[in-house]
């Protein structure tokens, strides 16, 4: 029994130690990272806070009903001195003690500011702030997704580069062996052998550096997903053939639909509403109030008679002079409104500029990819032909090395253009998903 238990335990521990997270697409990785990102969690909490502020603002304009209970034990009843002329004696005063030892007063009272226009405006402002918080949370998510996409596709590019480097290392190893064979047969001198070895060492060093870059890119993905660096993360997707985004470019024509523009526009509305609210504070407060109370006094706790009292009334209150505070508040709110409008105009201008830049970058990247893909294909074909000629002693090593250098340059250019394409693609798709 113990042996079986230990076997099961070892299998469980082995499974736990080799557990890993695997993602097949960017969307799957992004969903996981967004779900676990602390900034996104804080944005969700801020949204809930604004919702509570909205509910609180509603409560501020509703009637207030209070219940009270007062029990007083008059250890020494207060004495009232009444001066006067008593029994023909002037400058005489009499002392009286009023009340009982115990005084009990339960009751209810209610009040309602029926002309709280500023409070009603604050409800509308709080509702708008709640919408802004929701949009801001979406904006944070979109910005994070852009960062995630940049890091994700950067990792895919490092993996693609590794494939090129591994292939180049295999090629240089083949050249090194061919040169060594020729050297033994007396067909080439030591210089050519050493040059093939040098190229092979360069490729080996490049492989080591490329692997380090890939590891760093993978660690960055772990950090963005809020994973410990010791966690095993596997991305199975590879760089795909670029697809046309012409249908998505239409979204770049209307900058007002961008989340940044929506947030800026809502802030203008809130600033305008704040200005209105400050102006409404000039109106007088009109309060309705009412109360209903019971009172009982006695020298000991007993079933004494209860006396009732109730009242209703209307109270109108306004500030005649308050040091100009209301005027200053209105002016400050108006300046904030003007500032918010400037921010909106600036946001729309920047979005328009960014949209046009994205459009041009996309068109250029598509054209460049078409050319570098053809260049890479030709360079690979040229190297195949040159290697064949070199193997058959038709082409000298210097010319083979030149063709090989052209292939390396074509590979590098291809990766650079693919990287530029995905950078533009991520930004455009982030806008489309808004």
Where do the protein language model's features map onto the residues?
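Bacterial Sec-pathway N-terminal export signals of envelope proteins
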Residues: 19-70, 76, 225, 229-269, ...
């Amino acid at each position: 029994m113990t042996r079986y238990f230990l076997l099961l335990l070892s299998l469980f521990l082995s499974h736990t130690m080799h557990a890993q997270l695997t993602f097949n697409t960017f969307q799957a990785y992004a969903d996981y990272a967004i779900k676990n990102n602390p900034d996104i969690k804080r944005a969700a909490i801020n949204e809930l806070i604004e919702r509570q502020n909205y509910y609180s603002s509603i409560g501020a304009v509703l009637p207030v009903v209070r219940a009270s209970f007062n029990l007083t034990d008059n250890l020494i009843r207060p004495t009232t001195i009444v001066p006067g002329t008593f029994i023909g004696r002037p400058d005489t005063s009499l002392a009286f003690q009023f009340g009982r030892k115990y005084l009990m007063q339960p009751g209810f009272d209610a009040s309602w500011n029926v002309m709280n226009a500023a409070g009603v405006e604050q409800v509308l402002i709080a509702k708008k702030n709640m919408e802004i918080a929701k949009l801001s949370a979406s904006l944070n998510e979109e910005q994070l997704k852009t960062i995630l996409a940049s890091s994700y596709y950067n990792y895919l590019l490092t993996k693609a580069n590794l494939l090129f480097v591994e292939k180049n290392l295999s090629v240089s190893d083949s050249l090194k062996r061919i040169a060594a064979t020729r050297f033994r047969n007396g067909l080439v001198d030591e210089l050519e052998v050493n040059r093939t070895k040098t190229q092979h060492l360069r490729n080996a060093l490049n492989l080591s550096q490329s692997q380090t870059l890939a590891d760093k890119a993978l660690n960055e993905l772990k950090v963005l997903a809020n994973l410990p660096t010791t966690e095993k993360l596997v991305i199975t997707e590879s760089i795909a053939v670029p697809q046309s985004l012409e249908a998505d470019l239409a979204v770049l024509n209307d900058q007002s639909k961008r989340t940044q523009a929506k947030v800026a526009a809502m802030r203008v509305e809130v600033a305008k509403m704040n200005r209105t609210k400050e102006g409404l504070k000039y109106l007088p407060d009109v309060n309705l109030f009412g109360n209903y109370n019971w009172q009982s006094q006695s020298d000991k706790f007993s079933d004494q008679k209860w006396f009732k009292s109730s009242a209703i009334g209307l109270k109108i209150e306004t500030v005649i002079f308050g040091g100009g505070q209301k005027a200053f508040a209105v002016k400050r709110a108006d300046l904030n409104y003007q500032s918010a409008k400037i921010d909106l105009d600036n946001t729309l201008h920047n979005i328009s500029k960014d949209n046009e830049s994205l459009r041009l970058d996309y068109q250029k990247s598509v054209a460049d990819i078409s050319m570098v893909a053809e260049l890479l294909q030709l360079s690979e074909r040229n190297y195949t032909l040159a290697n064949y000629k070199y193997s058959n002693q038709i082409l000298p090593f210097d010319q083979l090395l030149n063709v090989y250098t052209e292939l390396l340059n074509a590979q590098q250019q291809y990766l650079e253009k693919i990287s530029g394409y995905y950078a533009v693609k991520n930004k455009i798709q982030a806008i489309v998903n808004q």
